[in-house]
């Protein structure tokens, strides 16, 4: 027969094991959520084919008829969670099946909860012919909750473009305001340092892993406007290489998209990137970039797993710049 002391010890050990397993499971779930990709390649190919089909349809039909079809909830261009929206290059919405209130409205400054100007980003993608970007938008299949979305946009002609996207529903999407403010301050500090000390001295400081511009996983990266890597303290082997077409695990060209932001002066963007504290595994990152001058730009980013990023609880915000 077991003594009461042994039985109590057994209960305590079992309880400790349960707590340990629960913590491990939670950590694993968090890591999965911050590193999620569109792991079904057919989803990406389906998205591309869907947008190209809509683009070709728009080129074959007159614009009014095409936009009417794109705005039809029960039409041929609404397939599950895939649907087509369309804008002209001024940012005027010309078609949307789930936001009829958008049609005819100027949405060029439409901003998601983390400061990403999604219509400008999608327009830049389509100006290149076609390309991907990330943004947050309400998911009509999930009670209009704000969710991260990988969008794909394609130019119809010189006047307008069409787009669609795939929701990444499990990823945390809201980066705390304090984290974003600290990110902006860090980048501003780096730009000021570059302006006061010159490009050569600044790049030397930015690439010093033991220097003041590497603070754990918060560090400065820098490129010229051709996509040549100038500062990557955790990836020195990439310095001097052409990274213009570098893609994340979902095919998003994050350097090109960053250049788009820098050409506007500054801006936010999402991408998946190697996390130095996780053996360089890719995970969701919110980046902020600024131009230094007409020749080069710099930026930094915060990882979702390290900034207390959270999931949506409701559709909270899709506003215009200056209204938040």
Residue ranges and their predicted role:
Residues 2-13:
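Bacterial N-terminal signal peptides that target proteins for export
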Residues 5-6, 22, 320:
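Generic short N-terminal amphipathic or hydrophobic helices
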Residues 27-324:
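N-terminal membrane-sensor/transducer module of prokaryotic signaling receptors
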Residues 12-22:
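Bacterial N-terminal signal peptides
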């Amino acid at each position: 027969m077991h003594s009461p002391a042994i039985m109590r010890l057994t209960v305590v050990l079992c309880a400790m094991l349960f707590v340990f397993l629960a913590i491990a499971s939670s950590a694993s779930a968090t890591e999965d959520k911050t590193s999620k990709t569109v792991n079904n390649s057919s989803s990406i190919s389906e998205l591309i084919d869907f947008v190209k089909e809509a683009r070709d349809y728009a080129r074959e039909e007159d614009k009014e008829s095409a936009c009417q079809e794109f705005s039809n909830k029960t039409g041929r261009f609404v397939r599950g969670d895939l649907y087509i929206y369309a804008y002209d290059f001024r940012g005027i919405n010309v078609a949307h099946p789930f936001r009829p209130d958008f049609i005819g409205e100027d949405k060029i400054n439409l901003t998601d909860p983390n400061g990403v100007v999604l219509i400008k980003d999608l327009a830049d993608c389509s100006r290149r012919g076609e390309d991907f970007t990330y943004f947050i938008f309400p998911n009509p299949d999930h009670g209009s909750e704000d969710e991260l979305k990988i969008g794909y946009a394609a130019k119809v002609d010189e006047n307008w473009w069409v787009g669609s996207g795939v929701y990444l529903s499990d990823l945390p999407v809201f980066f705390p305001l304090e984290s974003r403010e600290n990110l902006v301050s860090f980048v501003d500090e780096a730009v000021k340092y570059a302006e006061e000390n010159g490009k050569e001295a600044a790049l030397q400081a930015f690439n010093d892993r033991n220097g003041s511009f590497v603070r754990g996983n918060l560090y400065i990266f820098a490129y010229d406007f051709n996509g040549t890597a100038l500062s990557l303290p955790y990836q020195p082997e990439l310095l001097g290489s052409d990274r213009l077409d570098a893609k994340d695990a979902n095919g998003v060209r994050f350097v090109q998209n960053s250049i788009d932001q820098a050409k506007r002066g500054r801006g936010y963007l999402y991408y998946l990137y190697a996390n130095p504290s996780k053996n360089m595994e890719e995970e969701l990152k919110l980046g902020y970039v600024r131009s230094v001058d007409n020749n080069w730009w710099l930026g930094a980013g915060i990882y979702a797993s390290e900034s207390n990023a959270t999931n949506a609880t409701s559709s909270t915000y899709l506003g215009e710049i200056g209204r938040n």
